[in-house]
Amino acid sequence: MDKLILGRYIPGNSIIHRLDPRSKLLAMIIYIIIIFWANNVVTNLLLLAFTLLLIFLSQIKWSFFFNGVKPMIGIILFTTLFQVFFTQGGSVLFQLGIIKITSLGLSQAILIFMRFVLIIFFSTLLTLTTTPLSLSDAVEALLKPLVRFKVPAHEIGLMLSLSLRFVPTLMDDTTRIMNAQKARGVDFGEGNLIQKVKSIIPILIPLFASSFKRADALAIAMEARGYQGGDSRTKYRLLSWQLKDTLAIILVVILGIFLFCLKSPSRLT
């Protein structure tokens, strides 16, 4: 539980914490677009330097960000190795039988790896410096113009808030169920792949049952308190967009324009 990052907020008074959640969410959207623009070593290194600077300004321990990467290591390695061995083009760097590593495959693997890390670092920074409630309010506020097109902005924000809130709860339930199964003699680390998959079933069934019970209890509690969504609801804390939020968005946009001018037209250089 201590290593769980998703849905976790670290209180603080840094400049990143004090930004309006709407500006942080907009900055993340722009930042992700910039990441997929960046297609050479220089632009990716500049993005990495910018991200590390933001992490430093947030005054949050670096270990939180590395823990955010850990759950994704398997996917990152699989995707990176897939690019190395199956992307052909450029000069051949290594060949052993049908296995061939080319310069294009290696360059694409590096790009994929850096994009994963940058996106995870920035999204982790967003969740660690923004409360789930503020984040859901930001989503609702940004979707507000779409209400005229029948988009349920408030309900989407509510779902996001509840999802982030239930992630730590589900992890607690998973740990509790695993400990109970281990006490009954279940070994989750032994056997072949099929046996390991089968050993997960005793976890999934009670976990799903517990999740449905919690969701049902939450729905009953909300109905008992007379909950009604939509524009009629008021906010305990009102969002306040300030000059620093505008400057933050301008800074990210300027960074994007600068990196777009540096980017290679088609390949890693």
Curated annotation (Swiss-Prot):
Molecular function, one GO term: transmembrane transporter activity
Spans through the membrane: 28-48, 49-69, 73-93, 109-129, 246-266
Membrane-topology descriptor: Multi-pass membrane protein
Annotated localization: Cell membrane
The entry's keywords: Cell membrane, Membrane, Transmembrane, Transmembrane helix, Transport
UniProt superkingdom: Bacteria
Cited Pfam families: CbiQ
Gene Ontology cellular-component terms listed: plasma membrane
Primary location recorded for the protein, binned into one broad class: membrane
Keyword Membrane: yes
Assigned protein family: Belongs to the energy-coupling factor EcfT family.
Annotated HAMAP family: EcfT (MF_01461)
Function per UniProt: Transmembrane (T) component of an energy-coupling factor (ECF) ABC-transporter complex. Unlike classic ABC transporters this ECF transporter provides the energy necessary to transport a number of different substrates.
UniProt subunit comment: Forms a stable energy-coupling factor (ECF) transporter complex composed of 2 membrane-embedded substrate-binding proteins (S component), 2 ATP-binding proteins (A component) and 2 transmembrane proteins (T component). May be able to interact with more than 1 S component at a time.
Name by which UniProt lists this protein: Energy-coupling factor transporter transmembrane protein EcfT
Taxonomic classification: Bacteria, Bacillati, Bacillota, Bacilli, Lactobacillales
